[in-house]
Amino acid sequence: MSKFKYNNTIKNQGIQTIFGLHSVKAALQNDKRELIELIISKNQINFDKKYETKIQKITILPQNEFTRRYGTNNTTQGVVLKTRDFSRPNLEEFVKIESKKSKSVILILDQVTDPQNIGSIMRSCALFDCEGIIVGKDNSPELTSSLYKSASGAAEIVNYIRVTNIRRAISYLKKNNYCCLLYTSPSPRDR
């Protein structure tokens, strides 16, 4: 028996770090989120003015301290938000909510493991009014800082639903009157 026990309920106390101007702005505007701390570099001093009423703790760091904490790469854009993620619906809850609408578009992805690809797809989904993305738990990334950054705010409005079995998810959607159009890329031997 291992002396190390992993308790996924404690994992990082549910605190997420979101960075980048668009991602942080979208998270600050999401009333479902519990906001913990907004950290900005002095170079982004005007950023906090708009959100002073939304968040209790705002920390303004000198540029050299901000760089020491968050790195020299430009991906943070001088803005970091510490927050707790909000409750996201599972497949059954999502279908129940969406069934009240006249139309609903869902994208199902399998074997897309790069968080930056998922983030890019989320941006496209937001543009085309796709309400959700369904992915397999074993072959997809969790919602991480890099996924939030590449989604550029779309992760706040597009539901990200991780399921154990995609085939069962498709069957469930069909039983709930969804028309499922499937595409798979050809295998190497089919080429």
Task: List each model region and its residues.
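N-terminal positively charged helical leader segments and presequences
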Residues: 1-100
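Fold-independent oxyanion-binding glycine-rich loops
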Residues: 21, 42, 84, 109-112, ...
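A generic structural signal for secondary-structure junctions
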Residues: 29-32, 148, 152, 189
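Alpha-helix C-cap/termination motif
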Residues: 30-31, 101, 176, 187
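RNA substrate-binding interface of SAM-dependent RNA methyltransferases
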Residues: 96-182
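Single conserved hydrophobic/aromatic residue that forms the stacking wall/gate
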Residues: 183-191
